[in-house]
Amino acid sequence: LSLILFAAYAGTALADITPTAPGPGDTFAAGSDCTIKWTADVSGQWTNVTIYLMSGSNDNMTRVTTVASGVDGTDSSLSPYTWTCPEVDPYSAIYFYQLTNGANSPESAWTTRFAITSASGDSQPPAHTTQPAGDAVPWGEGHLASGGTVSAQEVGSDDASSSD
């Protein structure tokens, strides 16, 4: 019986959307294309995904901006999703994406951290080399530069894009 319950639980866990990129060492320049890739949810549950650009520690994440909303995470043709990287402060390898399943859903998935650099490629090391709990995952607090704003795109609008 416990094997059956484990198999049922494992099947449910594997049905979620799974971010696959960006990853450690990936770098994107502000003003250029940023991409996020994921493996589509085959359970049919992740049909209203919101993608956030985040920073902060693993235990105290901070939303930098909303990248897109209304993404159908079950549609594999929408991955990779491309958007314009914003101007951020600091330019560093402290950013990651959080994908949530619907506005009121506690379900989330995350990418690993990646760098956003200046248009000329300048960046600085993360402010912290380890997480508060001691894990060797560099992090820092980032935000949009100069009070800039980024408009989230509703997927399906003329400005939102995905590419193969």
Question: What residue ranges belong to the model's regions?
Answer:
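Classical eukaryotic N-terminal signal peptides for Sec-dependent ER targeting/secretion
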Residues: L1-L5
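Mature extracellular/extracytoplasmic regions of secreted and cell-surface glycoproteins
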Residues: F6-S163
